[in-house]
Amino acid sequence: MSQREAGQVDLEAWQPRTRVGRLVKEGKIKSIDEIFRRNLPILETEIVDYLLPGLDHEVIDVSIVQKMTDAGRITRFRAVVVVGNKDGYVGLGKGKARQFRFAIEKAIRNAKLNIIPVRRGCGSWECTCGEAHSVPFTVRGKSGSVEVILKPAPKGTGLVAGDVAKVVLRLAGISDVWTFTKGETRTSYNFARATYLALRNTYRFVTPADWAEARLRL
């Protein structure tokens, strides 16, 4: 199930509740990269809607959870959603609610709050195209028992990954990658989160390009 987020939030009527939100609404922060560069917290989904309009989202898992209370058994839906612009930004979230639609809406909001930048590149020695179609180097992520390793692949390889990981990679803008997995990958959330954390680790290393960009800002 894939849809495009459009027109859900009235940004003109948005009244920011945080300092970062006010800076965005006033035009003092003009890009989401500036937020990540300054390590500022994203606590309002409208910040993401304002700076990254037109995000896609895809529901990767919906399950029913039950809880026993004094009033009896309460049944709720749990949804796991991935959001991304297919161009270097991706987020993962989950939400619970008594109604299916509200669970998805809550998961989308949480995914937007968890949005991260993804460094892309052409890291395979078999490919010298220089385009941002894969990961620039090998990265790994772990969630629960699931570990995911992403390795650069030459252009045209495609996404050699499980269905859940493919969704995360595609919405992040990765089109070619080798993946290696360990653990219980049937657990959709842990599989998706391990992939998400591996992509987050693409910015854990400082590259020569980062130093060059830092010098230009000085």
From Swiss-Prot:
SUPFAM superfamilies attached to this UniProt entry: dsRNA-binding domain-like, Ribosomal protein S5 domain 2-like
UniProt-listed GO biological process terms: translation
Top-rank taxon: Archaea
Keyword entries, A-Z: Ribonucleoprotein, Ribosomal protein, RNA-binding, rRNA-binding
PROSITE patterns with a match to the protein in the record: RIBOSOMAL_S5 (PS00585), S5_DSRBD (PS50881)
Gene3D superfamilies according to UniProt: 3.30.160.20, 3.30.230.10
Statement: the UniProt record of this protein carries the keyword Lipid metabolism: no
Claim: Transmembrane is one of the keywords in the record: no
Positions of the S5 DRBM domain: 55-118
Complex and partners: Part of the 30S ribosomal subunit. Contacts protein S4.
HAMAP family assigned: Ribosomal_uS5_A
Role description: With S4 and S12 plays an important role in translational accuracy.
Family the entry assigns: Belongs to the universal ribosomal protein uS5 family.
Name recorded for this polypeptide: Small ribosomal subunit protein uS5
Organism: Aeropyrum pernix (strain ATCC 700893 / DSM 11879 / JCM 9820 / NBRC 100138 / K1)
Gene (name only): rps5
